[in-house]
């Protein structure tokens, strides 16, 4: 690092134009700046500084402090100045170093201003001209630290962050997790154990994997990377319906749907801190000499749209949504598990721009309720998942009633994780977590209040007086990854199987809702007539025209979890009725076809519909496994 330190009567600047393709995002207020009676510090961050930027920051701050104390300066102007060196660091590293110098000087009590990075700027200053008014410094890191080592240190810092664990009851009682009586809350106890132990590796295959294979829904793809799956027609139908359902719910809530790229530039300055957190978990793509990473959320694209948008206070809260197909994370191979943890996944992702904390908390509560509603629609009630709420001690002390209200809404005790200080970008977060048959938990719905990224990405809104303001941002996935929803549905049914209860999909998600079984070929025409009527009513139906015996046909339908089995013979044909086996209650009844249609439509009203994913006749279908 090269530094030129000038004690000046004043320093002022004005941004003229971009010097980099992706400069630091700035507001209109940041396009000009001035400080009087100031120590101006012109800085070139060099290539060698990349080996240990943290050491360079510490040394630079110490040198600046030494000079400031000698000249008795209380104001410091950090000014990016590329012209002190011909061996410059990468823009993302340079910006990180400059930001950290600014932050650390401010923490030490100085009034600090930093000129924007990545722009051509005009500037004026007036050097005081005394013996210490013009000084230069060169800083060289003594110990080279690789980027990988820096990120290992970051992960270690996160792991060492002390968590305080409590159970919060709907009555508002906050109880140390070791003192809570878990009687009647055994699933919560399993979730607590999982969270505190943080053991993500399963020692055996979870039951949903067997079910997804048996049902010919989803399978492993040996021709791809681990954690990338193939979907057979029935699995694709379920996944597609879930995608449509969640998207419709979010748009109904008031979000605007967008679409953004799946890859982003490694050197984009606003993305640097995201990327450095978990570098080993990114897929990297090269295009020419440039490196790109595959997104692991929709945040990047939506934030960049918001940065370029003109947003008024009248537009707030502003909700934006994308269903990412796909998001990518190179999860550790030992943590990959069926549909529970993948490397390529489909994430419904909504981001809300909120004016202030009051509006953000109001949205947080609404999105909490929205998430409950979305999960209810896929067959998951509060009895099926456990709630975790995470925040700092300060937030709890200032917003206790708000947190207690969340426990009241869910109507049962929730897990609290509390920190003494904020390490992450959010100040409040909840997740609805499904605990599976191996006592492993997976987060489904989640909402976070983000206090950092609006500033990092340069997202602004204009208030009533036309002044630029920095908002807060809520991250919301009302269902969690679509694959995880499928995992939770299958794991819940596996639990029911263990209790001797017949497993079922929610009716609107059943790939085949009705199977028609003719007792003989002579009533095949009537079987096809019945199927045609049902199909005309937008009910997914098929016909077992194979040569199997009747009992075997019924067993096949049972194994496929088909909700309604219609058996038609000569009697039904003559009377124009159907004999229905209802899976939900095990009853067999004779009824008019119109009554069955009415019953099914009543249960699927309000949910999306897609046609049957396979041929009408079973004899025409391929077998995808075995």
UniProtKB/Swiss-Prot annotation:
The keyword GTP-binding does not apply. Keywords: Aminoacyl-tRNA synthetase, ATP-binding, Cytoplasm, Ligase, Metal-binding, Nucleotide-binding, Protein biosynthesis, RNA-binding, tRNA-binding, Zinc. Its main location: cytoplasm. It comes from the Archaea. Residues 1-145 are annotated as: Editing domain. Residues 207-506 are annotated as: Catalytic. Its EC number is 6.1.1.3. Transmembrane segments: none annotated. GO terms for biological process: threonyl-tRNA aminoacylation. GO terms for cellular component: cytoplasm. It catalyses: tRNA(Thr) + L-threonine + ATP = L-threonyl-tRNA(Thr) + AMP + diphosphate + H(+). Its cofactor is Zn(2+). Binds 1 zinc ion per subunit. The keyword Isomerase does not apply. Zn(2+) binds at residues 299, 351, 475. Coiled coil: none annotated. GO terms for molecular function: ATP binding; threonine-tRNA ligase activity; tRNA binding; zinc ion binding. It is found in: Cytoplasm. Belongs to the class-II aminoacyl-tRNA synthetase family. PANTHER family: THREONINE--TRNA LIGASE, CHLOROPLASTIC_MITOCHONDRIAL 2, THREONINE-TRNA LIGASE. Catalyzes the attachment of threonine to tRNA(Thr) in a two-step reaction: L-threonine is first activated by ATP to form Thr-AMP and then transferred to the acceptor end of tRNA(Thr). Also edits incorrectly charged L-seryl-tRNA(Thr). NCBIfam families: PRK03991.1, thrS. Homodimer. The N-terminal domain is an archaea-specific tRNA-editing domain that hydrolyzes incorrectly charged L-seryl-tRNA(Thr). Catalysis of tRNA editing is performed by the charged tRNA itself. This is Threonine--tRNA ligase. It comes from Thermococcus kodakarensis (strain ATCC BAA-918 / JCM 12380 / KOD1). The lineage of its organism: Archaea, Methanobacteriati, Methanobacteriota, Thermococci, Thermococcales.
């Amino acid at each position: 690092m090269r530094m030129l330190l000038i004690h000046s009567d004043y320093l002022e600047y004005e941004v003229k134009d971009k010097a980099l393709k992706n400069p630091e995002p700035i507001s209109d207020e940041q396009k000009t700046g001035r400080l009087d009676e100031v120590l101006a510090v012109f800085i070139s961050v060099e290539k060698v500084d990349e080996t240990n930027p943290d050491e360079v920051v510490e040394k630079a701050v110490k040198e600046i402090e030494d000079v400031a104390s000698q000249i008795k300066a209380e104001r410091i102007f950090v000014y990016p100045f590329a012209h002190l060196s011909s061996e410059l660091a990468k823009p993302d590293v340079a910006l990180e170093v400059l930001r950290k110098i600014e932050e650390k000087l401010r923490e030490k009590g100085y009034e600090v201003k930093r000129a924007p990075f990545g722009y051509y700027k005009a500037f004026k200053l007036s050097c005081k001209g005394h013996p210490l008014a013009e000084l230069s410094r060169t800083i060289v890191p003594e110990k080279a630290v690789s980027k990988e080592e820096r990120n290992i240190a970051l992960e270690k810092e996160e792991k060492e962050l002390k968590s305080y664990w409590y159970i919060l009851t709907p009555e508002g009682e906050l109880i140390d997790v070791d003192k809570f009586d878990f009687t009647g809350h055994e699933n919560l106890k399993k979730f607590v154990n999982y969270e505190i132990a943080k053991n993500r590796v399963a020692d055996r295959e979870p039951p949903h994997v067997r079910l997804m294979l048996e049902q010919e829904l989803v399978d492993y793809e040996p021709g791809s990377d681990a954690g990338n799956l193939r979907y057979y027609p029935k699995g694709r139908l379920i996944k597609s319906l879930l995608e449509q359902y969640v998207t419709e719910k979010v748009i109904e809530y008031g979000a605007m749907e967008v679409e953004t790229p799946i890859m982003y530039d490694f050197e984009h300055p606003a993305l640097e801190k995201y990327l450095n957190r978990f570098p080993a978990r990114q897929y990297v793509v090269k295009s020419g000499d440039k490196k790109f990473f595959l997104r692991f959320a929709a945040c990047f694209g939506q934030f960049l749209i918001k940065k370029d948008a003109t947003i008024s206070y009248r537009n707030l809260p502003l909700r934006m949504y994308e269903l990412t197909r796909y998001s990518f994370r190179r999860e550790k191979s030992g943590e990959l598990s069926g549909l529970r943890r993948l490397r390529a996944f489909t994430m419904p992702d909504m981001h809300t721009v909120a004016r202030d904390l009051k509006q953000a908390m109001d949205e947080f509560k609404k999105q909490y309720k929205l998430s409950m509603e979305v999960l209810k629609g896929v067959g998951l009630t509060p009895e099926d998942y456990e709630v975790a709420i995470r925040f700092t001690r300060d937030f709890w002390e200032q917003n206790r009633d708000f947190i207690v209200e969340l426990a009241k809404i869910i109507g049962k005790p929730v897990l609290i994780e509390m920190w003494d200080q904020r390490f992450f970008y959010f100040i409040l977060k909840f997740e609805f977590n499904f605990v599976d048959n191996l006592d492993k938990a997976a987060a489904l719905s989640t909402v976070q209040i983000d206090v950092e990224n609006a500033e990092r990405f340069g997202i602004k809104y204009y208030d009533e007086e036309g002044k630029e303001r920095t908002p807060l941002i809520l991250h919301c996935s009302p269902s969690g990854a679509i694959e995880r929803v499928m995992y939770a549905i299958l794991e819940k049914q596996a639990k029911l199987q263990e209790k001797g209860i017949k497993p079922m999909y929610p009716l609107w998600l059943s790939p085949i809702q009705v199977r028609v079984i003719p007792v003989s070929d002579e009533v095949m025409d009537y079987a096809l007539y019945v199927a045609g009527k049902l199909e005309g009513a937008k009910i997914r139906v098929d016909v077992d025209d194979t040569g199997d015996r009747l009992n075997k046909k019924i067993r096949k339908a049972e194994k496929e979890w088909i909700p309604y089995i219609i058996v038609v013979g000569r009697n039904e044909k003559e009377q124009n009725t159907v004999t229905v086996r209802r899976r939900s209650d095990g009853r067999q009844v004779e009824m008019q076809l119109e009554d069955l249609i009415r019953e099914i439509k009543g249960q699927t009203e309000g949910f999306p519909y897609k046609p049957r994913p396979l041929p009408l006749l079973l004899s025409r279908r391929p077998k995808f496994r075995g």
